[in-house]
Regions:
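A short, Trp-centered hydrophobic/proline-enriched beta-strand micro-motif
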Residues: 6-21, 59-63
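Acidic-histidine catalytic/liganding microenvironments
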Residues: 11, 56, 94
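A short mixed-secondary-structure module that forms the rim of ligand-binding clefts
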Residues: 32-68
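Short glycine/serine/proline-enriched coil/turn segments at secondary-structure junctions
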Residues: 23, 68-70, 122
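Hydrophobic/aromatic beta-strand elements that line small-molecule binding cavities or substrate pockets
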Residues: 29-32, 76-78
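Charged, gly/pro-rich active-site loop segments
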Residues: 73-134
Length: 134
């Protein structure tokens, strides 16, 4: 597992920042999986966050790990992917999502990763650890 993935697991909940025209929007997320050294996330196709990312794919993910009092900044460009294996991994880890994303509801899960990305772990003393991303 990568340091990025481990940090997100430790934090549990992380926050995704997008732009709605000139207004920043931030919301909590928790779904993520790692495959082939890349981190993948998911949002619903029926949500504003999805439309915001389509319009402006530059986003930032921030997570805070309370035990160490460190936080993660993961910034990059959203790229949506069609990956049945990642989708299945997400459903295995979060089976309740099958109740939301299915043919009956008509809602689709949109899977994304970040490209041209940087990731840093920071602490309150100003220390910065740059993470190597695949």
């Amino acid at each position: 597992m990568s340091k990025l993935h481990d940090f997100l697991n430790e934090a549990g909940i992380f926050y995704l920042a997008t732009a709605d025209d000139d207004q920043p929007k931030v919301r909590p997320l928790g779904a993520h999986v790692e495959e082939d050294g890349k981190e993948y996330f998911t949002v619903g196709d029926f949500k504003e966050v999805y439309r915001q990312m389509v319009k402006n794919p530059r986003v930032e993910i921030v997570a805070f790990e309370p035990k160490t009092r460190r936080w993660l900044r993961y910034t990059g460009k959203v790229v949506f992917v069609d990956s049945p294996s990642v989708e299945e991994k997400i459903f295995q880890e979060l089976p309740h999502l099958r109740q939301m994303y299915n043919d009956e509801t008509g809602y689709k899960m949109k899977i994304f990763t970040l490209e041209d990305a940087t990731a840093k772990i920071l602490d309150m003393q100003g220390n910065v650890e740059e993470l190597e991303l695949k």
